[in-house]
From Swiss-Prot:
One GO biological process term: mitochondrial electron transport, ubiquinol to cytochrome c
Other known facts: Heme 1 (or BL or b562) is low-potential and absorbs at about 562 nm, and heme 2 (or BH or b566) is high-potential and absorbs at about 566 nm.
Membrane disposition: Multi-pass membrane protein
Job description of the protein: Component of the ubiquinol-cytochrome c reductase complex (complex III or cytochrome b-c1 complex) that is part of the mitochondrial respiratory chain. The b-c1 complex mediates electron transfer from ubiquinol to cytochrome c. Contributes to the generation of a proton gradient across the mitochondrial membrane that is then used for ATP synthesis.
Keyword Mitochondrion: yes
Family: Belongs to the cytochrome b family.
Protein name: Cytochrome b
């Protein structure tokens, strides 16, 4: 009799993906973030579902319904803060995951990499729309400012913005459709994750050396299932510490003031995980130029497979490229800091320099350093 795990049409898919999957024997903890992102997505869908049971997508009652969830619903405060801080964890792991992909040359799996970038856009869109739902001051003004950027698109811009708003300003129609999209997108993301994994399992995982590991593979279970569970344990400790001790640490105090179209907050800014892109947007004193720079700051990831000129896949044995990688990370920290600062001297010039360095490092410095390393190694 054949093993059900290997013969059942449904179970064998799970078996080939998570149990008998041949995995490189040397993958480090940097490979844990994929599974952590999966857990985060599941957690967000679950907590989001319970929040949606009590939330009302109406401008007059949205803010009150969130207050009601926190005060009157059993463990509503816990669900709400797990959802809000879960989004922060999601983005931390997402950036680690992308950083690992850049460092170890995982972007050479073109299909997996490109669907990953589309996933990033989908997650960013979901998070942005979710931030609008509590209908606080920063929700309202953030929605107004960011959607207004589309008016920079030539010819169709202004019409497009009014079409998205469902009127002449951010109002009831906007909130309702944002809730609808915020609810449906995570399920679309789940489907995209499956495609992401499908492409990954066609090639097999990369490893820290960047070399072919076909000669040294081990089954995913139990070796990496136990490793992933440990990662999830660390993640839950981090998330629950944040939720229980400082739930509002990463939020904005302005969002505890109900939305008021007649009163603009002194500094309109998005959640911390968008600040680097927001800083790049603000560093160009032209509306269309800023929007193009904003989109380019993410789309530039698609160029990594093209600008990879090194004969080695991974950065493990390329010290000069490693220095540039960490320069890029430091640069992103500077951009994140600048994105949260007011538009005044010296922050303007720092933001412009950091934005320029970001693009220059990826487009010029990294490829030219790779060529130099090839020469040094007589390749």
């Amino acid at each position: 009799m054949t093993n059900t795990r290997k013969s059942h049409p449904l179970i064998k898919i799970v078996n080939h993906s998570f149990i008998d999957l041949p995995t490189p024997s040397n993958i480090s903890a940097w490979w844990n973030f994929g599974s952590l992102l999966g857990v985060c997505l599941g957690l967000q869908i679950l907590t989001g579902l319970f929040l949606a049971m009590h939330y009302t997508a109406d401008t007059t009652t949205a803010f009150s319904s969130v207050t009601h969830i926190c005060r009157d619903v059993n463990y509503g405060w816990l669900i709400r803060y797990m959802h809000a801080n879960g989004a922060s964890m999601f983005f931390i792991f997402l950036y680690f995951h992308i950083g690992r992909g850049i460092y170890y040359g995982s972007y050479t799996f073109m299909d997996t990499w490109n669907i990953g970038i589309l996933l990033l856009f989908a997650v960013m869109a979901t998070a942005f729309m979710g931030y609008v739902l509590p209908w606080g001051q920063m929700s309202f003004w953030g929605a107004t400012v960011i959607t207004n950027l589309l008016s920079a698109i030539p010819y169709i811009g202004p019409t497009l913005v009014e079409w998205i708003w469902g009127g002449f300003s951010v109002d009831k129609a906007t909130l309702t459709r944002f809730f609808a999209f915020h609810f449906i997108l995570p399920f679309i993301i789940t489907a995209m994750v499956m495609i992401h994994l499908l492409f990954l399992h066609e090639t097999g995982s990369n490893n820290p050396s960047g070399m072919n590991s076909d000669s040294d593979k081990i089954p995913f279970h139990p070796y990496y299932t136990i490793k992933d569970i440990l990662g999830v344990l660390f993640m839950m400790i981090m998330l629950m510490s944040l939720v229980m001790f400082t739930p509002d640490l990463l939020g904005d105090p302005d969002n505890y003031t109900p939305a008021n179209p007649l009163n603009t907050p002194p500094h309109i800014k998005p959640e911390w995980y968008f600040l680097f892109a927001y800083a790049i947007l603000r560093s160009i004193p032209n509306k269309l130029g800023g929007v193009l720079a904003l989109v380019s700051s993410i789309l530039i990831l698609m160029l990594f497979p093209i600008t990879h000129l090194s004969k080695q896949r991974s950065m493990s044995f390329r010290p000069f490229s490693q220095c540039l990688m960490w320069l890029l990370v430091a640069n992103l920290f500077i951009l994140t800091w600048i994105g949260g600062q007011p538009v005044e001297h010296p922050f303007i010039i720092i933001g412009q320099l950091a934005s320029m360095t970001y693009l220059f490092t990826i487009l010029i410095l990294m490829p030219s350093t790779a060529l130099m390393e090839n020469k040094l190694l007589k390749w």
